[in-house]
């Protein structure tokens, strides 16, 4: 494994890039397909660490897969697991851990069908307490095997329909998990969201996909959902996994710094992903964007406008703004991103630390970063904290006069294994 990658200074970025399939869509699609009673053909399924963990878990529950080039056939079990494994290892895949907690609570048949969910060291630091607190009062059998509120944990049966409440301010994955699980219960349920809901576009993504898989949920208000019970996931026959809109943000930023044009294939005006809205951010920072149905083209002048913006809806893509801020004409403030602290690493602290190593002046608050433009560049090695987004974000520093070294670039295998080879292809001096 390459321990670091040295990026010489770049001035230009142009060409065409095809995005890998979205991790968020891929893992939802895998689980929904596994809950269907008839096969589902998935197209453009991302092959990465996170999707591999979900596939391995579903396979251990009895689901089988058939791969043929860019097509994956999922032979679902309709929610009735065939002699499920007693332990599922999910690495650091939050998009696997959180929904499986809820779905297993809804589908395991008896107390003798216990399943342990565990992950790597970082996963055991990522909170699930709000999700567990939502399902335990309705009968879900959950035993913490380590620190209370965190994996590893043991799941057994018992979840009953009824009224559910959950704090929406920590992670939208908890809400998506319940939306996927509650339709499987024998009776009707309601789900009420408390607090300031974070990453709402990911909830909208889940609702759209549930509809595609035959599940009906009524949104009584932005904070309350009526969920009929006794539903069955219906195979759509074939399902296309969109390109990763979060990954598109790096190419939009590179096109702004390197002038472009860069055609980004896989996400366009018809995308169901909230992170497509990053295109509006990059326009505010000085880029020009033209949209098509499933692609967009981005160009820039090399000049970056500083911004002050609330990123509650698109926190993942918001990370890309941080390195861009170093090139800006005035300070940039990234607001309302408290949930960065419960991601693959504490992203607020990690981002501030690495920006300061470059020499930047950074104000780190509980839920914001304020970043001053950098006047004098120096070449340093960026630590990535086993976080794919840290690695990809800081690749943009290669557009400085000093270049940059990225430690542990292999962490990009989580969502974008080919990122640095694509970066070298499109970005040059």
UniProtKB/Swiss-Prot annotation:
Biological-process GO terms, alphabetical: amino acid biosynthetic process; aromatic amino acid family biosynthetic process; chorismate biosynthetic process
Cysteine pairings via disulfide bonds: none
UniProt keywords, alphabetically: Amino-acid biosynthesis, Aromatic amino acid biosynthesis, Cytoplasm, Transferase
Positions of 3-phosphoshikimate binding: 23-24, 28, 171-173, 199, 316, 339, 343
Subcellular location: Cytoplasm
Binding site for phosphoenolpyruvate: 23, 94, 126, 173, 347, 389, 414
Keyword Cytoplasm belongs to the record: yes
Location of the active site: 316
GO cellular component: cytoplasm
Single annotated GO MF: 3-phosphoshikimate 1-carboxyvinyltransferase activity
Recorded metabolic or biological pathway in which this protein acts: Metabolic intermediate biosynthesis; chorismate biosynthesis; chorismate from D-erythrose 4-phosphate and phosphoenolpyruvate: step 6/7
Pfam families: EPSP_synthase
CDD domains in UniProt: EPSP_synthase (cd01556)
Enzymatic reactions: 3-phosphoshikimate + phosphoenolpyruvate = 5-O-(1-carboxyvinyl)-3-phosphoshikimate + phosphate
EC assignment: 2.5.1.19
Major localisation: cytoplasm
Subunit organization: Monomer.
PANTHER family, A to Z: AROM/DEHYDROQUINATE SYNTHASE, PENTAFUNCTIONAL AROM POLYPEPTIDE
Family note: Belongs to the EPSP synthase family.
Primary role: Catalyzes the transfer of the enolpyruvyl moiety of phosphoenolpyruvate (PEP) to the 5-hydroxyl of shikimate-3-phosphate (S3P) to produce enolpyruvyl shikimate-3-phosphate and inorganic phosphate.
Protein name: 3-phosphoshikimate 1-carboxyvinyltransferase
Protein's organism: Idiomarina loihiensis (strain ATCC BAA-735 / DSM 15497 / L2-TR)
Gene: aroA
